[in-house]
């Protein structure tokens, strides 16, 4: 997928999750 410039190491994807991004390997991907 495409990296969404947000990490999800400590907290889940927040803002980018609204854009359809999900956590994968500690990084939010679309």
From Swiss-Prot:
Crosslink site(s) for Cyclopeptide (Gly-Asn)? 1-30
> Could you state what the record's PTM comment says about this protein?
This is a cyclic peptide.
> Where are the annotated coiled coils located?
none
In which tissues does this protein get expressed?
A: Expressed in roots.
Residue pairs linked by disulfide bridges in the UniProt entry: 4-21, 8-23, 13-28
Task: Write one Pfam family the protein is assigned to.
Answer: Cyclotide
Its GO biological process annotations read: defense response
Q: Which UniProt keywords apply?
A: Disulfide bond, Knottin, Plant defense
Q: What is known of its domains?
A: The presence of a 'disulfide through disulfide knot' structurally defines this protein as a knottin.
Stated family: Belongs to the cyclotide family. Bracelet subfamily.
Q: What does this protein do?
A: Probably participates in a plant defense mechanism.
Protein name per UniProt: Root cyclotide 1
Q: Which organism is it from?
A: Viola hederacea (Australian violet)
Q: Species lineage, top-down?
A: Eukaryota, Viridiplantae, Streptophyta, Embryophyta, Tracheophyta
């Amino acid at each position: 997928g495409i990296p969404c410039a947000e990490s999800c190491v400590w907290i889940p994807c927040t803002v980018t999750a609204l854009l359809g991004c999900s956590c994968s390997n500690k990084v939010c991907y679309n």
